[in-house]
């Protein structure tokens, strides 16, 4: 039985950026996961051998996004193989930083390389997004797209239901604060349940236009406009922020320290602020940490847009 190995890295991400729910996410070089796979021909199973790394203890037993994503890839690419997976967990789970998406992205990138499949990036995003079912109960593609593509990722489905993904390269700086307060099991799914099933036509149009404005501002390097639009969500963030420790205090501190914009990172509890420079990002991160008085052991970091998933071994 012939076997091959590959190891891939994928970075953390911040989804939504305010009004871009399930459509926008930015890869951040704050944290990363690595996944090593051993792929053997002739088998028909996918399993996780080991989860290690700084945040391995936060990974729940049971369905795993990396394994789920690999199963989807093998099934839809028509490949039979036995795949053993080792996950190095460098992205804190359950914190709104795309931890599950990073594992899934690294896994499909590694398997694609090990099998020399040369899977196009849009399909890699699709398979990684399928892996999110293990964490959220349903596929979603924003974090997976950011971790696969890098930079600012935009995801959409066309009239035929085909997933379309786009990478927007841009220069920016972010401050990230991550409260380590306890979160409910299956936090992503729980935080989706607080959202409304229906919204008004007016609110939908306003959010669509603001999300489009974020993309245009990123393309044009207009960080001031991008930051203002990050703070304009009227649908998702207003319903989630009450679940986030010290949201109001941290937001106020970030803006007083010079942040151009502020939003939850995904479903939280992490929060991100857009900064005008790398030095400002560090200063804003310090202010956010100091203000997070109701946060348990908050982690803060200054970050920039990260590259996409890559094979590292």
Curated annotation (Swiss-Prot):
Transmembrane segments: none annotated. One of its GO terms (biological process) is threonine biosynthetic process. ATP binds at residues 92-102. One of its GO terms (molecular function) is ATP binding. HAMAP family: Homoser_kinase. Belongs to the GHMP kinase family. Homoserine kinase subfamily. This is Homoserine kinase. The keyword Cytoplasm applies.
């Amino acid at each position: 039985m012939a076997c091959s190995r590959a190891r891939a890295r994928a970075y953390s991400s911040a989804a939504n950026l305010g009004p871009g729910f399930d459509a926008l996410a930015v890869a951040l070089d704050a944290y990363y996961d690595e996944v090593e796979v051993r792929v053997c021909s002739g088998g028909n199973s996918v399993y996780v051998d080991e989860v290690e790394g700084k945040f391995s203890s936060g990974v729940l037993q049971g369905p795993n996004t990396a394994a789920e994503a690999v199963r989807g890839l093998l099934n839809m690419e028509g490949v039979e193989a036995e795949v053993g997976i080792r996950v190095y967990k460098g992205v804190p789970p359950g914190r709104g930083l795309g931890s599950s998406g990073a594992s899934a992205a690294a896994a499909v990138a590694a398997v694609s390389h090990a099998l020399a499949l040369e899977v196009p990036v849009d399909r890699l995003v699709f398979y990684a997004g399928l892996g999110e079912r293990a964490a959220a109960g349903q596929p979603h593609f924003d974090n997976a797209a950011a971790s696969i593509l890098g930079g600012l990722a935009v995801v959409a489905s066309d009239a035929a239901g085909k997933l379309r993904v786009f990478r927007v390269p841009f220069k920016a700086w972010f401050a990230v604060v991550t409260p380590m307060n306890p979160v409910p099991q299956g936090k992503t799914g729980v935080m989706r349940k607080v959202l409304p099933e229906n919204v008004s036509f007016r609110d939908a149009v306003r959010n669509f236009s603001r999300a489009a404005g974020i993309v245009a501002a990123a393309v044009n390097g207009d960080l001031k406009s991008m930051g203002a639009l990050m703070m304009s969500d009227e649908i998702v963030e207003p319903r989630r922020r009450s679940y986030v420790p010290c949201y109001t205090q941290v937001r106020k501190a970030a803006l007083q320290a010079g942040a151009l914009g502020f939003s939850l990172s995904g479903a939280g509890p992490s929060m991100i602020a857009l900064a005008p420079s790398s030095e400002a990002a560090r200063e804003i991160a310090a202010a956010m940490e100091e203000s997070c008085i109701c946060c348990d052991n908050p982690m803060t970091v200054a970050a920039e847009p990260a590259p996409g998933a890559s094979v590292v071994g």
